Amino acid sequence: MKLVIHPAVDQARLTEITKAAGTMTIVNATDEPSAVLALSDANAFFGKLTPSMLAVAQNLEWVQCPTASLEHFVFPELIEHPCVLTNMRGLYSDVIADHVFAYILCFARNLHLYLRQQMRSVYEPIGGEAARTAFATGPDHISAIDRAHLDIADCTLGVVGLGSIGREIARRACAFDMRVIAVDPVQMEQAPNVSVLLSLEELPRLLNESDFVVIAAPHTPDTER
């Protein structure tokens, strides 16, 4: 068995791959001509495959895409090829969910505005310095500063697509005590961490009720509208 990798991975990753591969021959191709030469008798490939590389791969049985999305990876010859094509589905769910909540917290607490103000040495709260609550006003006073910021525990998060990424985002939302509503074309039964599960036809309801909306659907002709 022979595995070709292109673009080449760093030495640390190559060492781990070699350990896992056992007796398999590993070729870490630094350029496309080297990859083309090695693919002539290769059984497996990891990385970014091109039509010219596939054309010489007579024994190719398995192609591993290094990303979860495939829209920038596949091409007609690969679609027609009998090899098995796999992706990194589920591998990036936690990273993407963390990134989503970085944005949610940023906009909820106006961090994007505070950073701009900081660059100008302005430290006034969003809502105005005059809106600061004095002790005399009492704890029930709602100021312009309060209204300019969101408590995400009072917010609704809409999730479009309940794949591995969408479910991980919903799990984090529940940890922040957010209400989660979702739409998915496949998930018909109530999903964990989702308060309301809607059909695709009910997408307008999700958009109407959500303070934040996350599109976690794959990029396909059906979702590009």
Task: Tell me the role of every PLM-derived stretch.
Residues 166-167:
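N-terminal Rossmann-fold NAD(P) dinucleotide-binding loop
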Residues 156, 178-179:
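Residues at the starts of beta-strands that form the adenosine-phosphate
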Residues 1-89:
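An N-terminal-biased, well-structured beta-alpha scaffold segment characteristic
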Residues 181, 185-225:
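Rossmann-like adenosine-cofactor binding region
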Residues 83, 89-156:
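Phosphate-binding beta-alpha-beta segment of Rossmann-like dinucleotide-binding domains, i.e.
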Residues 162-163:
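Glycine-rich Rossmann-fold phosphate-binding loop(s) that bind the pyrophosphate
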Residues 5, 157-159:
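Hydrophobic Val/Ile/Leu positions in short beta-strands of Rossmann-like dinucleotide-binding domains
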Residues 173:
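Aromatic pocket-lining residues of Rossmann-like dinucleotide-binding sites
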